[in-house]
Amino acid sequence: MAADIREIAIDVVFDSEGSARVTERWDVDVDSGTEWYLAKYNLGAISLEDFSVSDESGMQYSYEGPNWDTDRSLSRKAGRCGLIVTRGGYELCWGLGSYGHHIYTASYTLKGAVQALDDCDYFHMQMVSPG
């Protein structure tokens, strides 16, 4: 996938139970490939739930669950999103739909994102994967 990233905006809201609701807005120009994905690895005991994607038109993508098929064509992935569960975490995937300028908004919940110690609570996570 070749893309120019114009802007990335990430908002994180924590709840009283230690979960984090994450909203990532990706403003991109895409000229090849069939899908976009966000790698979320090394999560330990943190689980990922409630994944959703919308685009600049406001269209909500259809969630297909944890069995995302990477081998489908551009048109067969359009308007769809899903997960790939790996040993180290998750890949959050969605179809590009078409080439050109797009603004994708991906949202998800990280259950158990805030960890408790004896003297404090903490959140430590790499939000944008390298590469």
Task: For each feature predicted by the language model, list its residue ranges.
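Lumenal/extracellular ectodomains and adaptor appendage modules
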Residues: M1-G131
